[in-house]
Amino acid sequence: MTVMKFDLIKKEGKARRGKITFPRGDIQTPAFMPVGTYGAVKSLSPVELKEMGAEIILGNTFHLWLRPGTEIIKKHGSLHGFNGWDKPILTDSGGFQVFSLGKMRKLTEEGVTFKSPVNSSKVFLSPEISMQVQRDLGSDIVMCFDECTPYPATEKEAKESMELSMRWAKRSKEAHGDNPSALFGIIQGGMYEHLRDESLAKLKEIDFDGFAIGGLSVGEPKEDMIRILDHTAHQMPEDKPRYLMGVGTPKDLVEAVYRGVDMFDCVMPSRNARNGHIFTSEGVIKIRNSKYKDDTSPLDPNCDCYTCKNFTKSYLHHLDKTKEILGSRLNTIHNLTFYQNLMKSIRKALDEGRFSEFRKEFLASYK
């Protein structure tokens, strides 16, 4: 019996306003989860994440299992005890990271054998091992182990990949056993609607606490992503959280909420921050550009983050040019605050019954 509770508070069209409740805290949805691959959101402390409004973060099963390993994390009680984040944590299963290894992996019915990117040793990961690792981490939301279907994939390749993921989903559910953490199933099927339908039907039959759409934002054209979202999102169970994995840009989030998605994660705001790409209410600023050398205005006059309240574009340009660590930190604080503020604005618009209007205005003004 899971300790997670999901309340669907309000709907506007397909867009949903909800709340996910855990013993460690509530998550207002639609929600964006900052990514802490190795247990930390790069350059930020848990206090800073809370200040910007984050209510859940994502950790990476694959990387934490390889380093530092679950024995060390278990000595701290859980990943929460290890990294000082006392709110909910979602961990992905490791499937996407294994997919990212490409030819360095060997896939069988049992699982995946690959060369460790840490020390080049031979490593085996299966649904059962992934579930045990996530249990050891004390994750609040556990993702079932799947194979992320690559893009492009023929219909035959996508079908075989999806069917393997569904067999692994069943094994994940069995291995999850009496773990009170929530277990989410992942819909696969590539760019083929009928395969997505088959996948969702199978996952409903196995019965999960939440449902995720995987295998998007893997290199496909934007129109294909929207097509699959349009087809799939609203068919996911109404009474359970819906999670779109690894997506995306601010526009992607607004468009996915419009289609019925509740939860998101993406490395984009933090990774782009380190490369000097800043999200603002009017679009992206490339702070490396010489035109900001003597610009004394803040990044975004509509933003209340620490960076915007205290520093100018000129100073941030200087930090970027001199490769100061502080530049990455200040950019990351701003970008992740921008994402959290976007989700707050979406939730407020849904609360007030004007999300459709908000979407039109946002898509028109955001370049």
Curated annotation (Swiss-Prot):
The keyword Nucleotide-binding is annotated on this UniProt entry:
no
Molecular function as annotated in GO: metal ion binding; tRNA-guanosine(34) queuine transglycosylase activity
Zinc as a keyword?
Answer: yes
What are the GO cellular component annotations? cytosol
Q: What are its E.C. numbers?
A: 2.4.2.29
Q: Which residues bind Zn(2+)?
A: C303, C305, C308, H334
Which UniProt keywords are present, listed alphabetically? Glycosyltransferase, Metal-binding, Queuosine biosynthesis, Transferase, tRNA processing, Zinc
**In what pathway does it function?**
tRNA modification; tRNA-queuosine biosynthesis
Binding residues annotated for substrate, in chain numbering = D92, S93, G94, G95, F96, D146, Q188, G215
Protein name per UniProt: Queuine tRNA-ribosyltransferase
What taxonomic classification does the UniProt entry list for its organism? Answer: Bacteria, Pseudomonadati, Pseudomonadota, Gammaproteobacteria, Thiotrichales
